[in-house]
UniProtKB/Swiss-Prot annotation:
Belongs to the LuxS family. It catalyses: S-(5-deoxy-D-ribos-5-yl)-L-homocysteine = (S)-4,5-dihydroxypentane-2,3-dione + L-homocysteine. GO terms for biological process: quorum sensing. Fe cation binds at H54, H58, C125. Gene3D superfamilies: S-ribosylhomocysteinase (LuxS). The keyword GTP-binding does not apply. It comes from Lactococcus lactis subsp. lactis (strain IL1403). Its cofactor is Fe cation. Homodimer. This is S-ribosylhomocysteine lyase. GO terms for molecular function: iron ion binding; S-ribosylhomocysteine lyase activity.
């Protein structure tokens, strides 16, 4: 069976919230993609509720693209502690952490409302009833209050 990098990570040693570069890959035509572990909560200590996580996912899909070109995907971990962020090109953890921080700041703001969350209607979402803007905002505030580190093992908050 193939080894999966994220299952090799010692989840007992990391200090969330953080952004970690998992790795870069070069395709057959020379295109580079980078994969990041965007960890919002401490593994095995907490988990973001599904409705809040779902709304964070939808909101960040747009907010991140407003701030940086080349995002391929921002997908939640099944453990509900964070997201995989896949980008075209080479990017640093610091660059991505700044984008994540800025995006969460907008999501947490009083000005950000349901009109700003994309894809929450029945024809746009496969589980449109399972969203919580209140939860997404509360988690965003908590993550921001703890600070986003550029290192998973040592707190280097941006």
């Amino acid at each position: 069976m193939a080894e999966v990098e994220s299952f090799q990570l010692d989840h007992t040693k990391v200090l969330a919230p953080y952004v970690r570069l998992i790795g870069s890959e070069t395709g057959p035509k020379g295109d580079v993609i980078t994969n990041f572990d965007v960890r919002f909560v401490q593994p095995n200590a907490n988990a973001i509720g599904m409705a809040a996580l779902h709304t964070i996912e939808h909101s960040m899909a747009s907010l991140i693209r407003d701030r940086i070109d080349g995002m391929i995907d921002f997908s939640p971990f099944g453990c509900q502690t964070g997201f995989h962020m896949i980008m075209w090109g080479e990017h640093s953890s610091e660059e991505i952490a700044k984008v994540i921080k800025s995006s969460l700041e907008e999501l947490a703001s009083d000005e950000f409302g349901w009109d700003n969350v994309p894809g929450v209607a029945e024809k746009e979402c496969g589980n449109y009833r399972n969203h919580s803007l209140f939860g997404a905002k509360e988690w965003s505030k908590k993550i921001l209050s703890e600070g986003i580190s550029t290192d998973p093992y040592e707190r280097k908050v941006i």
